[in-house]
Amino acid sequence: MKTIQGVVAAPQARVAIAISRFNHFINDSLLEGAIDALKRIGQVSDENITVVWVPGAYELPLTVRALASSGRYDAVVALGTVIRGGTAHFEFVAGECSSGLASVALNTDVPVAFGVLTTETIEQAIDRAGAKAGNKGAEAALTALEMINVLKAIKA
């Protein structure tokens, strides 16, 4: 029996991070966590990390598709925060962002790591951006690296 498991060390990996400016006070922490994980744990060099800022989470799928389709990146990490408000806006943005990012991964065969927080409150978002619940940006970055290695092993 053969077992394929990814590892997170990927020193030669080329990784793009697409990040939303909206709710930047939370997203900045997600970005710091992602970059730290890529460099410290994944051993990815600065020159192999590209950060692309977009207006909001709704714009992430299009940007991630452009990055994944460029052939310049082994994986893309999507970071953002969508906080529920008093209208249906949350469902539309969170749903379209999530399904759009999944579609990009399936249609490009490039790993897309989902680091978009979808929370009920600002406090929950802060907790998931490095406070009580870890840093989901770092987790997404490690997921991207692991998936690079899993897909390489499958194709080998």
UniProtKB/Swiss-Prot annotation:
Residue sites binding (2S)-2-hydroxy-3-oxobutyl phosphate per the record: 86-87, 128
Pathway as given in its UniProt record: Cofactor biosynthesis; riboflavin biosynthesis; riboflavin from 2-hydroxy-3-oxobutyl phosphate and 5-amino-6-(D-ribitylamino)uracil: step 1/2
Gene Ontology biological-process entries: riboflavin biosynthetic process
Coiled-coil residue spans: none
EC number: 2.5.1.78
UniProt xrefs under Gene3D superfamilies: Lumazine/riboflavin synthase
GO cellular component, one term: cytosol
GO function term, MF aspect, one: 6,7-dimethyl-8-ribityllumazine synthase activity
Positions annotated to bind 5-amino-6-(D-ribitylamino)uracil: 22, 57-59, 81-83, 114
Catalytic activity: (2S)-2-hydroxy-3-oxobutyl phosphate + 5-amino-6-(D-ribitylamino)uracil = 6,7-dimethyl-8-(1-D-ribityl)lumazine + phosphate + 2 H2O + H(+)
Keyword annotations of the record: Riboflavin biosynthesis, Transferase
Active-site residues, record numbering mapped to chain: 89
Entry function: Catalyzes the formation of 6,7-dimethyl-8-ribityllumazine by condensation of 5-amino-6-(D-ribitylamino)uracil with 3,4-dihydroxy-2-butanone 4-phosphate. This is the penultimate step in the biosynthesis of riboflavin.
Oligomer and partners: Forms an icosahedral capsid composed of 60 subunits, arranged as a dodecamer of pentamers.
HAMAP family membership: Lumazine_synth
Similarity comment: Belongs to the DMRL synthase family.
PANTHER family according to UniProt: 6,7-DIMETHYL-8-RIBITYLLUMAZINE SYNTHASE, 6,7-DIMETHYL-8-RIBITYLLUMAZINE SYNTHASE DMRL SYNTHASE LUMAZINE SYNTHASE
Protein known as: 6,7-dimethyl-8-ribityllumazine synthase
Source species taxonomy: Bacteria, Pseudomonadati, Pseudomonadota, Gammaproteobacteria, Enterobacterales
GN (gene name): ribH
